[in-house]
Design a protein with these regions (language model features):
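Juxtamembrane intracellular "pre-TM" segments in multi-pass secondary transporters
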Residues: 1-8, 210-242
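Helix-loop boundary and gating motifs at the non-cytosolic
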Residues: 2-57, 237-267
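Central cavity-lining transmembrane alpha-helices of secondary-active solute carriers
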Residues: 47-69, 88-89
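Glycine-rich segments within core transmembrane alpha-helices of 12-TM secondary carriers
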Residues: 54-59, 152-177
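A membrane-interface helix-boundary motif in multi-pass transporters
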Residues: 75, 109-110, 175-193
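C-terminal ends and interior cores of transmembrane alpha-helices
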Residues: 81-113
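Cytoplasmic helix-loop-helix junction between adjacent transmembrane helices
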Residues: 123-160
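C-terminal membrane-cytosol helix-exit motif in multi-pass small-molecule transporters
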Residues: 193-212
Length: 267
């Protein structure tokens, strides 16, 4: 088999987008729980609601936007535009503060309850943009831009970035006083700017790869194709692997979003 050697520009895009995307997800999946607890005294039920709502938003978004990207044959637009809006949505959390909400809603019975509700809503909005850009289209672009001779290396880099992102976020923000509102303004400002910046960079760094749109014209049929019993029966080993991977990831997601909160509050 002939080895296809991607360009240095491609590898740079893989590293940057994989890492920054996962940094944003670490903030959303792990630090947002700390934010809503420390700033607004959110209950365990409210934190669980936020985690569940964002998980559903991520899953549905990936299916819908992934199918739409396949239908129109474009990845770059969704990646760059999604990262831009993802960065802006991260910035918006810096505005969810008690002093701001008290000024906007002076008659509110509980400003903290308003803040908790806004965080949950904006988490779903942020997840929509992030899943559109990263989960649905960036991962599809990786498949489009690689082949069987180099896909293992590409996916290897992409797969190690969640761990790298945890180290970056922990190392970067561990020394911050997370009991201060100003700290969270800084955290959201830094990550939002970083995500927005690579959204702009993508217009120059990402090369659009040809996407076969033939067979993807029927949008909803494309969405539900993978759920058909006949398709599952024809690809039993694939779905067995997907099922095992789903169980593994569900197990991780049961505790991982609460890990930092547990460390900071219980230990």
């Amino acid at each position: 088999m002939n080895q296809t050697k991607p360009s240095k520009k491609f590898w740079l895009a893989v590293v940057i987008y994989s890492l920054v995307g996962q940094v944003a997800w670490v903030m959303e999946n792990m630090y947002l729980n700390v934010f809503i607890y420390k700033m607004f005294n959110a209950s365990a039920e409210e934190i669980s609601l936020m985690v569940s709502a964002s998980s559903i938003a991520a899953t549905v978004t990936t299916l819908l936007i992934g199918a739409l990207s396949d239908k129109i044959g474009k990845r770059k637009l969704f990646i760059c535009g999604g990262y831009l809006l993802w960065g802006v949505s991260i910035w918006s959390f810096a505005l969810i503060r008690m002093d701001v909400i008290n000024a906007l809603f002076p008659a509110a019975v509980s400003a903290s309850s308003v803040c908790v509700s806004l965080v949950i809503i904006m988490d779903c909005v942020m997840t929509f943009f992030g899943s559109s850009a990263n989960d649905a289209c960036f991962n599809a672009w990786l498949t489009d831009a690689s082949d069987s001779s180099n896909r293992g290396a590409v996916e290897g880099i992409n797969s190690m970035m969640p761990l790298m992102a945890i180290l970056v976020v922990f190392g970067g923000f561990m020394s911050f006083d997370q009991n201060l509102p100003e700290t969270w303004v800084m955290i959201f400002g830094i990550i939002g700017t970083l995500v927005l910046g690579i959204g702009v960079l993508g217009f120059f760094l990402i090369d659009e790869k040809p996407v076969k749109t033939q067979g993807n014209e029927k949008y909803f049929a494309n969405i539900f194709y993978g759920f058909r019993p006949s398709v599952i029966g024809q690809n039993k080993l694939l779905y067995l692997a997907l099922g095992a991977y789903a169980v593994f990831n569900i197990s991780i997601q049961i505790y991982m979003p609460y890990l930092i909160l547990y460390y900071t509050v219980s230990l």
